Design a protein with these regions (language model features):
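Residues at beta-strand starts and edge strands
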Residues: 1-3, 64, 95
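Flexible glycine-/small-residue-rich
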Residues: 7, 70-72, 101
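Short, solvent-exposed loop/turn segments that connect beta-strands within catalytic domains
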Residues: 13-16, 74-78, 92-93
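Ferredoxin-type iron-sulfur electron-transfer modules in oxidoreductases and energy-metabolism complexes
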Residues: 31-50, 95-194
Length: 194
């Protein structure tokens, strides 16, 4: 498969950025989106050009670091998956693909496709602890939780903190992220004040 890539390039946070066009050829349909960017970067390095900076960590869909706007959609053409879980078979051979960083004041661009995610880190660091001794794990059957409540809690806990909600929200609000974090716990009976 062959693709034309329109990629946002920006030297640093203060520089004015813009789109640059690249071609990648002979890409397998089973290549992940990030692997395709790796191939592009290998080609650029071989040509003596600067590679495209992009963020990633686990490449398994659990960390949310690979956050990109692909053709105007957060994480690309699929629903409920991160960029690293997108495979090139989702795109038509010969397609032009536009790749941008998150567009939100909460995530200022550092370089190319890399954004500063510290705003979400601050939210996570602001809470998430209790002041009592927890001792050992309580008996799982001591406080029965209805399956519907447990299912809703698990759905909310599926949030990996990637920032897609804030990046696609016209207000750039991180409240969807905070709501997912809080909702995952709010549905579960705690049994004590805290």
């Amino acid at each position: 498969m062959n693709f034309t890539l329109k990629i946002w390039r920006q030297k640093d946070a203060k520089a004015k950025g813009g789109f640059e066009t690249y071609k990648v050829e002979n890409i397998s349909a089973d290549t992940s989106f990030l692997e395709m960017l790796d191939i592009l970067n290998n080609n650029l390095i071989h040509e003596g050009k600067e590679p495209v900076a992009f963020d990633h960590d686990c490449r398994e869909g659990i960390c949310g670091m690979c956050s990109l706007h692909i053709d105007g959609h957060a994480h690309g053409p699929s629903q409920a998956v991160t960029t690293c879980q997108i495979y090139m078979r989702k795109f038509k051979d010969g397609a032009t693909i536009t790749i941008e960083p998150w567009r939100s004041a909460a995530f200022p661009v550092i370089k190319d496709l890399v954004v500063n995610r510290s705003s979400y880190d601050q939210i996570l660091q602001a809470g998430g602890f209790i002041s009592v001794r927890t001792n050992s794990v309580p008996d799982g059957n001591a406080i029965p939780i209805p399956k519907a409540d447990a299912d809703e809690s698990m759905d909310a806990a599926a949030c990996v903190g990637c920032g897609a909600c804030a990046a696609t929200c016209k207000n750039g609000s991180a409240m969807l992220f905070v709501a997912a974090r809080v909702s995952s716990l709010a549905k579960l009976t705690q049994g004590r004040v805290e």
